[in-house]
Amino acid sequence: LKNVKFISSNPELYPPLTQLLTAENFTRPKDVAKSILSLLKQDIQIKDLLLKKNSAVSLNEATSISRKLDKFPLLHNLMRVCPLPDLEFEKFFITMRRLFLRNLNKVEVSPELIYFLSTLSIQCFINEYVYIESDEETHLISELEAEISQNLVQLMQPEAINILCLASYRPLHQYDWCQKLESLDNLGEVKKRLIEEPLLEKMIAKDIPMLEEISDDVSLKVRGQYEENPY
């Protein structure tokens, strides 16, 4: 499957490929990601969504798209285990992410939308927030950070959708208040992947013994990268 490129649609392959991704130690997701994406891009619904990526300018359309993507657990599972090596999908999700950030106060929350934003936040964490970000988005994220922080100071829990939107732009574990987010208690995988595991890795990194003091610039940079991502 590693070097296979699909040229026609075959939805019957979705369940076994989903199982392939979720079975532990069976294959490395990044080795089959391009093949799986080539299959998904032959699906008429996915084709239609990708063609509309630059015209998805309304909140209603973005919400509708999140519902349609709910029918593709194969895509969701792939996004939760490895970066998507595909520029079309990247542009598509950049557009979706921006739309929901701009319209957070107007969004009609649904299980499908929460599932989509959960998947998107995990994907952005995995790809180390490589998606391009406009100045407008940076400003809106700063406002969202302040709003969530203020909510917690006032002993109010932020809406899950607000946290997920922030998590698609910034690593949640970097915030001092991340362990106070009870809104994520019903989103176990998000909480584990974006908060609990990174914090555990930080603790492990601190406990790694250092034989001698590091002084040269290159070694300091390497140590800094390792402490950020021990694995």
Q: Where are each of the predicted segments found?
A:
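N-terminal accessory segments
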Residues: 1-224, 228
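Hydrophobic pocket-lining residues within nucleotide cofactor-binding pockets
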Residues: 231
